[in-house]
Curated annotation (Swiss-Prot):
One of its GO terms (biological process) is methylation. It comes from Salmonella heidelberg (strain SL476). The active site is at K306 (proton acceptor). InterPro entries: RlmM_FDX, RlmM_THUMP-like, RNA_MeTrfase_FtsJ_dom, rRNA_MeTrfase_M, SAM-dependent_MTases_sf. Belongs to the class I-like SAM-binding methyltransferase superfamily. RNA methyltransferase RlmE family. RlmM subfamily. GO terms for cellular component: cytoplasm. Catalyzes the 2'-O-methylation at nucleotide C2498 in 23S rRNA. It catalyses: cytidine(2498) in 23S rRNA + S-adenosyl-L-methionine = 2'-O-methylcytidine(2498) in 23S rRNA + S-adenosyl-L-homocysteine + H(+). Pfam families: FtsJ, RlmM_FDX, RLMM_N. The lineage of its organism: Bacteria, Pseudomonadati, Pseudomonadota, Gammaproteobacteria, Enterobacterales. This is Ribosomal RNA large subunit methyltransferase M.
Length: 366
């Protein structure tokens, strides 16, 4: 199988294609990307027959910025007979996947696919039963086995394949299903909540998002991101010239500092988190983030970079390379991840975690 499907935000297919071509090429997995504007997915076709599986095995999914999900597939299945769509799908997967741990019947995230999504939901149950009977799926779901993907691009027309559970998105279609909290000051709160789900393993939340931590929110008004920190019982310094939502101030956990986020300097040395969603040029935001990390003003940060209209992958890559160079120059050991989240628009979200010298018993090496 030599094709890899990458799901992405509609309108960002070129960025997704540029990224996978670049990163696959650096691993000497050569091929070309098939791109259809606003399709919500890209197909990277490798020149060598087995390179599709090699790519999704060797390239860390967490290193991709513009892909929400990926999986290796075979040839396109077309003209599935309405009276029996299951048999051809099972036939394509037999001998390709043995004892997969989960089935996902998916579509691209476009308006055109909404009707198709209804069909996928109905189709999943009988298909799962047939795949279990054929030995393609285990009799129960398990995260230790490959995920089987059936990806419909039109009625009666789909790709079939698989991804590895340790190197994919754990979410259906790569999208965490989050509900907007009615008491949150703005919808931007969902960006930070999604970032926490994407960047921090669930079993580390109690340690890395602990009660009583100190956090800073730069450019906080009206408090969408501060809300997520308060919800996790942190003490938050919210920095913005604009006012904060009264509901947040009433918690007693928020200190509003009426200052410019670019000029603010923290006056305590035990800040665990700094978050930032300021509308500013990416280079200016990246330079500020580098300053915080190099000076050790926070342990972890999540921030957004607003994207230009053109050369968006190049712009993000340039800023992340600058950040890495600054950290390297000052001897700071850190882990950097970036992703265009479902709740992001013309932007990407970046997570950086400073790693200190190893201390016995601490998983984060602080």
């Amino acid at each position: 199988m030599n094709k890899v499907v990458l799901l992405c935000r509609p309108g960002f297919e070129k960025e997704c294609a540029a990224e996978i071509t670049d990163k696959a090429g650096k691993r000497e997995i050569f091929g070309f990307a098939r791109v259809k504007e606003n399709a919500g997915y890209v197909i990277y076709e490798c020149y060598q027959p087995e390179d599709g599986e090699k790519l999704i095995s060797e390239l860390p999914f967490s290193s991709l910025i513009f892909a929400r999900q990926w999986f290796v597939v075979g040839e396109l299945l077309q003209h599935l007979p309405p009276e029996d769509r299951i048999t051809p799908v099972v036939g394509m997967l037999q001998g390709v996947v043995e004892k997969g741990g989960e089935l996902r019947v998916e579509v691209a995230d476009t308006n055109e696919s909404k009707e198709l999504m209804k069909f996928c939901r109905k189709f999943t149950v009988p298909l799962r039963a047939a795949l279990r009977d054929a030995g393609v799926l285990t009799n129960y779901e398990t995260p230790k086995r490959p995920v089987v993907h059936v990806f419909f691009i039109a009625p009666g027309c789909c790709y079939t394949g698989y991804s590895f559970a340790h190197n994919n998105s754990p979410f259906y279609m790569g999208i965490p299903r989050l509900k907007f909290p009615s008491d949150a000051p703005s919808r931007s709160t969902l960006k930070l909540e999604e970032a926490l789900h994407v960047f921090i393993p669930e079993d580390e939340w109690d340690e890395r998002l602990a009660n009583g931590m100190y956090a800073v929110d730069l450019g906080a008004c009206p408090g969408g991101w501060t809300y997520q920190l308060v919800k996790r019982n942190m003490w938050v310094y919210s920095v913005d010239n604009g006012p904060m939502a009264q509901s947040l101030m009433d918690t007693g956990q928020v200190t509003w500092l009426r200052e410019d986020g670019f000029r603010y300097r923290p006056n305590r040395n035990n800040i665990s988190w700094m978050v930032c969603d300021m509308v500013e040029k990416p280079a200016k935001v990246t330079a500020l983030m580098a300053q915080w990390l190099v000076n050790g003003w926070c342990r972890e940060t999540i921030f957004n970079l607003k994207l230009p209209m053109k050369k968006r992958y190049e712009e993000v890559s340039h800023n992340l390379a600058y950040l890495q160079a600054q950290l390297d120059e000052h001897g700071v050991n850190a882990q950097i991840q970036a992703r265009q989240l479902y709740h992001d628009r013309e932007e990407v979200t970046v997570h950086v975690r400073r790693l200190w010298a190893a201390v016995g018993g601490r998983r984060d090496e602080r």
